[in-house]
């Protein structure tokens, strides 16, 4: 388990490139036949990937010990979105087949969660977020058709995109976790510009669908003290509540966003005009 501490905005503005990458970038999400896990002190979110190729992968008892509980989801909820081939997630004996760009929500208290691919030649890639939970809500599979879509932006500003909200109150109840997948329209490169912050929630962006020579310039920091990270395929960025989070790619890309915090109101944002950025 990789642990990322909370960091004050005054500290972050002093960091060089290596320091920013160390504090905010998760470089390695997928490892064959293993799970990865990054624990952030910011709202206690956990971020990672599970890539079952030749064998079943489960999050073991050692994680419970690190979290001070008997098992991973004893006091947590889990959201998973598959960006690879079709796979199976088994939750306490209940099997869910999860295809590409399909999601599964797992409620607090699930004791045994395992992950498999249907074909080792086209393995599933399960990207997940987990947040502390106070009660148990039902497990639920969400297909792309069942997600709540919202199209924003314009071709003229190169930010036309469709936000597919998988794990949000309009689709299913959760304690605090929300997740979705944003697809840019052909010829568009920007996400979330004009940008915003939300003091009530932190967020993690996971970028994918990028070839080796594609990169995203992910903008972060306070509006008057912006910085950037160069993000490559299947890497994630932790965004504190005080930071903007926006990106522009050298080519089109897709990203998954996940939020935890005070509320689940998607539109609760503090918008920032482009003219205010520095």
Swiss-Prot record:
Pathway: Glycan metabolism; pectin degradation; 2-dehydro-3-deoxy-D-gluconate from pectin: step 4/5. GO terms for molecular function: 4-deoxy-L-threo-5-hexosulose-uronate ketol-isomerase activity; zinc ion binding. Zn(2+) binds at residues 196, 198, 203, 245. One of its GO terms (biological process) is D-glucuronate catabolic process. It catalyses: 5-dehydro-4-deoxy-D-glucuronate = 3-deoxy-D-glycero-2,5-hexodiulosonate. Binds 1 zinc ion per subunit. Keywords: Isomerase, Metal-binding, Zinc. Its cofactor is Zn(2+). The keyword rRNA-binding does not apply. The keyword Iron does not apply. Pfam families: KduI. Its EC number is 5.3.1.17. InterPro entries: KduI, KduI/IolB_isomerase, KduI_N, RmlC-like_jellyroll, RmlC_Cupin_sf. Belongs to the KduI family. Catalyzes the isomerization of 5-dehydro-4-deoxy-D-glucuronate to 3-deoxy-D-glycero-2,5-hexodiulosonate. This is 4-deoxy-L-threo-5-hexosulose-uronate ketol-isomerase.
